[in-house]
Amino acid sequence: MRRLAVIASLAWALGGCATVAPPPQAAIPVPLADAWTLQGRLGVQTERESLSGQIRWQHGGGVDQVLLTSPLGQGVARIVRDPEGVSLELPGQPVRRATDVDTLTRDALGYELPVAGLAWWIQARPDPLREAAVALGDDGRPARIVQDGWTIDYLQYGADARPRKLVVSRAGLEIRLVADSWQSAP
């Protein structure tokens, strides 16, 4: 009997030392380097038209270069944003320049492409310099960000915890982005 009491006491004492695994935490997207490249597919739906194609976005050193191509790989538009402003190249047209992307794309395309905000949103983060509302999903990752009149819905995350599918929308415009690959530049 005494032996049973010693074993029970020992088990109780050791049980108090047992560690409990912490609850699982949401997968936090791996921060990208200051320079990165995103390749994927893009769909744009406006009240007048529906477009689809591919996107190659290089970001780094205060410069964004966005190349939009048709599903067959032909260049449709090239947007370059740097500290001096932004330029837009469309086939068969002179290069257009402006101080900001919103104005330039609105004038040239008839709708704004939020390149400055997208640089943050595609990383599942709001622009830290602007007010935003962030709704988290059950997994603790952003499910929706609302910022600057845009709503960003995160439909799927990749194995690396980075957004894979997202929808960016505002009245009369919906942009669907599927990130096929991310690369951090050296």
From Swiss-Prot:
It is a lipid-anchor. A lipid is attached at residue 17 (N-palmitoyl cysteine). Its main location: membrane. One of its GO terms (biological process) is lipoprotein localization to outer membrane. It is found in: Cell outer membrane. Residues 1-16 form the signal peptide. Pfam families: LolB. GO terms for cellular component: cell outer membrane. Keywords: Cell outer membrane, Chaperone, Lipoprotein, Membrane, Palmitate, Protein transport, Signal, Transport. It comes from the Bacteria. A lipid is attached at residue 17 (S-diacylglycerol cysteine). Belongs to the LolB family. Monomer. Plays a critical role in the incorporation of lipoproteins in the outer membrane after they are released by the LolA protein. HAMAP family: LolB. This is Outer-membrane lipoprotein LolB. The lineage of its organism: Bacteria, Pseudomonadati, Pseudomonadota, Betaproteobacteria, Nitrosomonadales. The gene is lolB.
